[in-house]
């Protein structure tokens, strides 16, 4: 009897340990919508796609929303597809109109990483407040880029994190199966040619004719560098108070006061569009991808292993903000960024206004 009870105990311990190590034994639910996107000017369209869970059971389809090209840095189009189980497998077939090709990918997904990111979530700054709230992601975004590049992200409010990069292969799909209607005497090539003419802008067609499709660009976007944003004010009272950053690799984040105060270097993709808020001014800057790739690669080659600073230097009265990249004792000015504008008031005016607001709030 003693031996029987001992064996039973060991079996229970083994089962409990096994359940503890398998994250999918848990009943956690993270509802999400599936979205699709593609680089601006390089339209893609889903033919058929779906996600399976770890038991190879269907979770949902990949939405068919027509041609998509909303941009690599944005969440893209929804189409009524989603679920709350952790996806473990993706099947996707789509057409790349710029390349006149169909692609297919059949791939296992890093389910444990997806679960980890759902659990970790992110902190979101509350509107007009320094307080934050803990949220998690609500969208699973599928990105399709030229060359069969497929990237998955988890997307939330002002936050986006890459899950994995997959490689699709060229595949034949009959145009009539894709379109589900037959145009008599139309060849497969004529179908591609017509879609190419209709889906691409004249400017991008000319660009492709002269320089070709920039294969590899979206993998260059994925390279990360150890850097931080640095503010070089002419008034020592001024400082960063908030940064909302989109990166060319499709990731996004808010950098809040506690992290800004640490002034730490972080591994990130090159910046795309950033909203910088200072003590009393704010600005929005769009960085040029080619310039940033060139400068960062140059700095990495000349200063291996050293962290990099992107420095913002305002001119008097914030009429303009100069941007440069610095590593050790070398500093390179940037010229191709676009500054959307500078908004705000002087620090003295801001301090006076805030003091009045505080006094009024206290009933004085």
Regions found by a protein language model. Give the residues of each.
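C-terminal motif of bacterial Sec signal peptides marking the signal peptidase cleavage site
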Residues: 15-18
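Tryptophan-paired
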Residues: 49-96, 239-293
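Long, low-hydrophobicity ectodomains and other hydrophilic envelope-associated domains
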Residues: 182, 190-275, 279-284
